[in-house]
Amino acid sequence: MTIDTPSWVRDAVFYQVFPDRLARSGRVEAPGELESWEAEPTTHGLKGGDLYGVVAHLDRLRRLGVNALYLNPVFASASNHRYHTDDYYRVDPLLGGNEALRELLDEAHARDMRVVLDGVFNHSGRGWWPFHHLLENGVDSPYRDWFHLSDEVRAGTRAISAYPSEEQVAEISRRHAAGAPFGTVSREVLGYEAWWDLPALPKIRLEHPPAREHILDASESWIRFGIDGWRLDVPEEVTASFWREFRTRVRAANPEAYIVGEVWHHKPEWLRGDMFDAFMNYPLNRALLGFAAQDRLDPVVPLPVEYEGKIRAYDGAGLWAAIQELDAVNPPEVTAVQLNLLSSHDTPRFLTFCGGDLDALRLATLLQMTLPGAPCIYYGDEIGMAGSADPDCRRAFPADPGEWDHAPSEWVADLAGLRHSSRAFRDAELSLLGTNGAAVAYLRRDGDEAFAVVANAGDERLRWDVPLTLAAPEASVVPIRGGAAGERSAAIVDGALRIGLPGRDGMVVRLS
């Protein structure tokens, strides 16, 4: 099967936006009191960020080197993260409604920036109107087949418990504690299947043609509205046949639409050209974290379930082995468009994982920007924002630039600019030059243009004659701000690349 991934993603530097937390524009009138912007985030509090606020940041992001946005869900919802969808055709009024998304798309596209939205199609919110219709009418509702109901509900002998009692909540917890897998209890206890047995998230019965068509039509409609792709939430909960049809419909509307799934591990059979273009690259994220942090990993930071037992310190050889493992399971067309992230709304921030060590964040950013795949910056990482597990990783972006740490923005801008300046970093050969303890050196080469990337995660200054696989008469250090920029050196000596690099630092060397 031909693997056809969008060409523009190879050139993309993404910026992930949590819409409620980037900026209040003042153009959306709140219906009531909001949570203080400066206060620590709470599980349910809304801070009032909106899509017009995202528009106000576009010029800053363009200067940073960003040319693509990934937005967490924007559709009408009763939750601040909006993974509880109430209407798949309507942008949340608190974000400015459909008009605000129209303006964001127009302003982004005018700046040659793409916009990818988050699609939550496995489950809806409890406020989705077909589910409300079912609550009001029971089995007499024509929407009864849109959801996974218990036999008793379908027979009309019991009602759905969408707002369960304390006893029902306790029963769900008791069954989980006894070993029942998440997602298997709610149908019996509540009368309907809910994602992870969370009552607010009824699972959609996508094998039912009208429900399936509703979701597929909404997905296609927003592509025609002008979005440039979909990031898809918990796609493994949905059948492969649905995603094949989804891809056919979406790609018919826009042959260059990007389809990226939230999959936390290897699943190469879904990346063969008939479903997804790419995944959120959490395996690479874990490897970069282990290499850049070394012994600085904060042991008290809560780990996502998918990270438990998988975070460890990597030396240079270990990092390269992890990279090679990913390359072995994915064809190059996929590797080139993987969404390479350091932080997300589902993980503690990279800087917090590393105990606040800015050198670790800088090293990881160097690797993220120079390895194959599309780098994705989580809002606020570029100004040194901290944040532990959800909801702490979803703090409000400081409105006052005086509160920002500008150093990360400087190295992000330099590295993104370097990536944009040469195809060698975007869609070209990657090969190992060597490893040396906690250091790694690799080559990015596109025709006559070649760069060596060297990262030293160790504490000591490194003097290393790196063997070269090409003839290079000259070597020059590419200026990148941050760290000990003035103490990096490189020269060609007897056919090798002799580098001098401080501890906890990295560099890019142009070979000519």
Regions found by a protein language model. Name each.
Residues 13-15, 69-71, 115-117, 230, ...:
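Hydrophobic faces of well-ordered beta-strands that scaffold small-molecule active sites
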Residues 20, 273-274, 278, 336-344, ...:
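Aromatic/acidic polysaccharide-binding cleft in carbohydrate-active enzymes
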Residues 39-51, 84-98, 198-211, 227-237, ...:
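The substrate-binding groove and active-site-proximal loops of carbohydrate-active enzymes
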Residues 105, 109, 122-123, 131-139, ...:
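Active-site-proximal helices and loops of the catalytic beta/alpha 8
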Residues 129-197, 201, 291, 299-323:
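Core domains of carbohydrate- and sulfate-ester-processing enzymes
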Residues 433-471:
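Carbohydrate-binding surface patches
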